[in-house]
């Protein structure tokens, strides 16, 4: 279940996720980690730490102009998630509605090897950061990343003793008021919890990405709950030295007890939010001792979108045998999947539903369908209507037809042209085609035939179905001519601005001795039409087998 639609509204990846194909074409170091399947779809193995690191470094380079190095044995941050946190801090300090020239100061508790929060905050907003770190490897990489991006004037990386949070870090800068602090605390209390042995619901699927964090980055005594409580206790001493204290949580169950702790301590302002990105969800908590600060609006309740199930029907083995018997004698008998797929292609061609073969896995056939008009509903009724309308077509009187003998044709037409100025009369087959079928033209027939001709033509125009008025032996050609001459619109939905009714992928696959047909909706609002087409295809396959 992808959560990108619920990202922070200012997150650049909300509506435009990273284009792996483009990034691979531009960055060779990223290209070596990209996989391309038979359908041409580009993907990345998020369980490979080298691939995750390549993606993070490539996104920072492409979208923010930042060059960083991250060791594989330390935490590799994902850019969209960190960007969500930065944007929420902007909301907390009312950054976009205030004087942007004023210097904003922040603290990043446990900045990590990437130093990603200070790098993003300084690059996007020009914020000043005090970044603390307890791990030697992370500290050295963080300093290097700041220096190679020429941000030493805005970011100060400080090595602090173990278990140092805010109090010891601010001893040397006792006069400075900071606007905020950020923290991505260690989520787990022990190794078993970090591996998901005793903390993860057994019904949940395993994580989709790899965890490369070091011991100090992913584990702390008491887990994230106790870690954040220590920050709360530091804030009770520092109080208004910081306008906002904040932290990000990896477990929803940590949020309620921490909010209760803040309530018990009498903290006046508390805010929380949720971060969505990819298949990952995080929670954030912030509190302030300033009465005048404005709390951002809480996140809206997110409606979970249930995945749409495909429309499915099964072609039984007995039906497949009947279809095989219909094949011409002596022809090669195809596989059951191919046989059913060929039947479906013929049905779609007869319906004029656009379709093309798309790459798929073994023992499977896939078609991409684009339906631009509803050509499968009420087909039998349409045939009856055409037959009825053929019987109602006006015919010229017998005396008029007899007067059009070949010997007298030229003389008769010239006399009519001289006397009345009317155009020459033509044969019946010509009078039914082209202009007369679209617009009643009474001057080419005697007055006695005019009422009979105009009445059915008005009915045709009111129904907008002139292509249904045709002879049995010329039905197809006449219908096409009439569509061209009358300029009839297609059956696509009017006023919607969409040139199609729906798009879907049709899969034909083996299921034991039967064949399974699935239709997956790709685009289009009306699933009823797709359901109608699915039912029609199923019924036609049965008719082909039993006819």
UniProtKB/Swiss-Prot annotation:
Main location: nucleus
Region VCR 2: start-end pairs: 500-547
Alphabetized GO MF terms: mRNA m(6)A methyltransferase activity; RNA binding; RNA stem-loop binding; U6 snRNA (adenine-(43)-N(6))-methyltransferase activity; U6 snRNA 3'-end binding
Gene behind the chain: mettl16
Known role: RNA N6-methyltransferase that methylates adenosine residues at the N(6) position of a subset of RNAs and is involved in S-adenosyl-L-methionine homeostasis by regulating expression of MAT2A transcripts. Able to N6-methylate a subset of mRNAs and U6 small nuclear RNAs (U6 snRNAs). In contrast to the METTL3-METTL14 heterodimer, only able to methylate a limited number of RNAs: requires both a 5'UACAGAGAA-3' nonamer sequence and a specific RNA structure.
Catalyzed chemical reaction(s): adenosine in U6 snRNA + S-adenosyl-L-methionine = N(6)-methyladenosine in U6 snRNA + S-adenosyl-L-homocysteine + H(+); an adenosine in mRNA + S-adenosyl-L-methionine = an N(6)-methyladenosine in mRNA + S-adenosyl-L-homocysteine + H(+)
EC number: 2.1.1.348, 2.1.1.346
Source species of the chain: Xenopus laevis
Spans annotated as Disordered: 383-473
Signal sequence, renumbered to the chain: none
An individual GO BP term: mRNA catabolic process
Bias-annotated ranges (Polar residues): 431-447
Name assigned to this protein: RNA N(6)-adenosine-methyltransferase mettl16
Keywords: Cytoplasm, Methyltransferase, Nucleus, RNA-binding, S-adenosyl-L-methionine, Transferase
Annotated stretches, region: K-loop: 163-167
